[in-house]
């Protein structure tokens, strides 16, 4: 008959587990007793209550106090919606606008139309500004205000004009540096630069993000390429696409933009693989034809 030997350490471990289990049970029982301590006292009979308790009622002052408490609570809710005094409103507003932009892109990717999204977004932004940015006090001198406004408008006009001139020059610079189509003759210029235009361009690109377009190959054939192969963020693609002449105007009018031309331009400036595969002269002609066809409609 075989003998079974038990390791003493296993016995000690089992005893320790039993002790811990007993302590756990005791702790649970104590917690239950503490939680039910209010039930262990003697019950209060209704007949033992003072006679004055039967005549208790709420008067008008109490009800008015309740109304004041409700109004205070509502005021506290409005204060919670507003910003703290120690926080910079400009930074918070910038963060809010960034979140709004991300939300717009997500809604457009889900299939919602831009005009509906934009109308709702404008209402939200107006509400935010109304709550957090009250009207500043008027200046006593109208001449100072007029002079300041004139200087600001002049600065904004100068900066906007310099930005518009820098966009075509940037496009020409990219076309010259990159080993792509050097002979593109683009006469149109981008003049609109607002969020609605960027959103429309992003919407059209996002809808065709995986669609493959035909491009001329160096091997006298064709190859397929799409926006997804760029490995770029949608925002960066939109910024590059705005440098293509005529794209901003088409997006502002709600027309279709030449996506193959845009893809060729962005890929030529950012993808070395695309530069090695594509035939530069043929690509130049294709991009020019696409641009002329879309802008002439």
Swiss-Prot record:
Chain spans, region DYNLL1 and DYNLL2 binding: 138-172
Post-translational modification summary for this protein: Phosphorylated by host PKC and by an unknown kinase.
GO molecular function annotations of the record: RNA-directed RNA polymerase activity
Any one of the GO CC terms: host cell nucleus
InterPro entries in alphabetical order: PP_M1-like (IPR004259), PP_M1_C (IPR037199), RABV_P-like_C (IPR049506)
Keyword Iron: no
A single GO BP: symbiont entry into host cell
Start-end of Polar residues biased regions: 158-169
Chain positions found as Phosphoserine: 63-64, 162, 210, 271
Swiss-Prot/TrEMBL keywords: Chaperone, Cytoplasmic inwards viral transport, Host cytoplasm, Host nucleus, Host-virus interaction, Inhibition of host innate immune response by virus, Inhibition of host interferon signaling pathway by virus, Inhibition of host STAT1 by virus, Inhibition of host STAT2 by virus, Inhibition of host TBK1 by virus, Inhibition of host TLR pathway by virus, Interferon antiviral system evasion, Microtubular inwards viral transport, Phosphoprotein, Viral immunoevasion, Viral RNA replication, Virion, Virus entry into host cell
Annotated motif Nuclear localization signal, positions: 211-214
Protein's UniProt keywords contain Chaperone: yes
Entries under Pfam families matching the protein: PP_M1
Motif Nuclear export signal, residue range(s) on this chain: 49-58
Family: Belongs to the lyssavirus protein P family.
The protein's name in its UniProt record: Phosphoprotein
